């Protein structure tokens, strides 16, 4: 699906907003790809982000899905807008066992006040495999 951003400077708007999220900095997350209707965020594994079995904590997985979806939607919004999450449901399909967590989100239905996105969260250890489904 091809989208036209309402803000020609959407990439800088996203990067500036992301830089104000202290938690993203704290966990070591980086935006690695931004396009109209799409955002990818990665975070490398570190012990401080793990749960009791040494896997990525589900809270970190959900955070990346939430942020990538929000920023995918934000790419299509006017310059003077802001964004907040309304709802998501997280189904964990596999443990967060990997060296790198990657969330790729795509807008599936843009709207004036509500935009629906589909994040896909992947883990990398020896290749990429999905670990979560969002609804």
Regions from the language model: what does each represent?
Residues 3-9, 79, 95-104, 108-135:
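HotDog/MaoC-like acyl-thioester-processing domains
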Residues 32-34, 93, 108:
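Short beta-strand micro-motifs enriched in acidic
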Residues 59-79:
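Active-site helix/loop of acyl-thioester processing domains in fatty-acid/polyketide metabolism
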Residues 45-46, 50-64:
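A conserved, well-ordered hydrophobic junction motif at loop->secondary-structure transitions
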Residues 1-42:
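Non-catalytic linker/capping segments at the edges of enzyme domains
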